[in-house]
Amino acid sequence: CFPPGIYCTPYLPCCWGICCGTCRNVCHLRIGKRATFQE
């Protein structure tokens, strides 16, 4: 996703959505990915 997206904190460690527009505190295996910055 471009431009770079949201920084995920230790409390909200997961990106959610195609562009990682929302950080969540739970990772779902298929639709969540753990990241600091989205790529």
Curated annotation (Swiss-Prot):
Keyword NADP included in the entry's annotation: no
GO MF: potassium channel regulator activity; toxin activity
Reported tissue expression: Expressed by the venom duct.
Top-rank taxon: Eukaryota
Isoleucine amide modification, residue list: I31
Keyword Disulfide bond part of the UniProt annotation: yes
Keywords from the named record: Amidation, Cleavage on pair of basic residues, Disulfide bond, Ion channel impairing toxin, Neurotoxin, Potassium channel impairing toxin, Secreted, Toxin, Voltage-gated potassium channel impairing toxin
InterPro entries in the cross-refs: Conotoxin-I_CS (IPR013141), Conotoxin_I2 (IPR020242)
Subcellular localization(s) per the UniProt record: Secreted
Disulfide bonds: C1-C15, C8-C20, C14-C23, C19-C27
One Pfam family it belongs to: Conotoxin_I2
Propeptide, residue positions: 35-39
CC per GO annotation: extracellular region
Family: Belongs to the conotoxin I2 superfamily.
Swiss-Prot/TrEMBL domain comment: The cysteine framework is XI (C-C-CC-CC-C-C).
Function as written in the Swiss-Prot or TrEMBL entry: Inhibits the vertebrate voltage-gated potassium channels Kv1.1/KCNA1 and Kv1.3/KCNA3.
Protein name: Kappa-conotoxin-like Em11.10
Taxonomic placement: Eukaryota, Metazoa, Spiralia, Lophotrochozoa, Mollusca
